[in-house]
Amino acid sequence: MKRLLLLAAASATALGVTAAKAEPLKIGIIESLSGAQTSTGRLYANAVEYGVNQINKAGGFNGEPVQVTEYDNAGGAPEAADKFRQAVADGVDIIFQGASSAIAGQLTEDVRKHNIRNPDSKVLFINLGGEAMELTGEKCQFYHFRFTTTAPMRVNALVNAMKAAGDLGTKVYSINQNYSWGQDMQKAVEDAADKGGYKIVGQVLHDVNKIQDFAPFVARIKAANPDTVFTGNWSNDLLLLMKATGDAGLDVTFATAFLDQPGNIANAGKTALGDYIANNYDNSATDGKFAEAYKSATGHYPVFVEGNSALALAQLQQALKTLDFRGGKIDVTKIALALEDSTYDSPVGPISVRKADHQTIRPVVVSKVVKNPKYPADGTDMGFQTVKIVPGDQAIYPVQSSCHMKRPKE
């Protein structure tokens, strides 16, 4: 089911009589809006809609309000491919997606092939959450932009911050989902072992969104007796892992990528205190202005993936301001080139785009679960407190040798 949103329609009046003649910029959200990943997919969609609303409040683009259509991929790559074809038929110019690297991998290939076959109606893919290394490696392509971190960026930030704080220990366990992202996380933990001064005492890759009870996995973790458990799990696989951890009263520090997903702190209970997360954004790392603006518009502070996703739209808005199609045809290639040249001063630091692979060079925020924070989570007295912000130029890694991007003729 799709939902067409003409956000901030009142802005159309301000655009005057030319609005009816102009070509609107069309955005498609191809997201997990049903199934096991809905809790994540809906937050991505919410953030995109918020960001588009901000663009429209400022006057829209190309003489029209920006249009947004939601497409439900139901958490699957084949469904995402079907929805991409539907989006193309609807004339979508830019697609957004975040929940699952597997789906992002499907979409970036769909976009690449479509653009080769249809040079006069290209589509741009802005990836909000697919963090698999291959997306800016062997699958890198000009019309894909990644507005999030990757496993090495998160793991290295965690290792450095936790070691400096004396919270890392010398024994580490790794539990991750068995697909591209989880495999990248496991490798990043292995690669950081020497620098972190720890030994890996156990690691496991498990099926994605199929485990209903993580108690056996928690028992294995307990038996290995680690100081820290690294996990890139997200959605139900993290919610259920945290529940099993809380139920078992497991006394171990978790180093995570997505602990701020709603429900995780409540599920883990007091065992969450002292756990870490490396993320794109944390309300506590900012002056609060963006968080308050988001709350004013949506009724809640940005949580989980909403912050960095909304900021990606703000960076797109900044890039669009440099373009003027005079109400005529939308040129996606020019939008991509404008994005390449953009640097956005986000609430946690500057975000730019590396032209060689379209990985954003962005700050990584390391936070720790504490009692009585400024922004409590899940209706508890616990939440996140920023420990360190790693600047983008320190967090980024070299372009992968497997990336051979073909650029358009300029």
Predicted feature descriptions by range:
Residues 28-49, 71-78, 99-100, 175-184, ...:
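Extracytoplasmic "Venus flytrap"
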Residues 46-68, 194-199:
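Signal peptide-proximal N-terminal region
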Residues 77-85, 134, 142-248, 280-289:
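Extracellular/periplasmic Venus flytrap/periplasmic-binding protein
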Residues 1-21:
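Gram-negative bacterial Sec-dependent N-terminal signal peptides
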Residues 343-410:
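Solvent-exposed, acidic/polar segments of extracytosolic/periplasmic ligand-binding ectodomains
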Residues 141, 242-313, 321-325, 381-409:
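Extracellular/periplasmic periplasmic-binding protein-like sensory domains
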Residues 87-101, 118-128, 171-176, 225-235, ...:
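Periplasmic-binding protein-like
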Residues 39-43, 61-137, 147, 206-214:
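Beta-alpha junction/loop-to-helix N-cap segments that form part of ligand/metal-binding clefts
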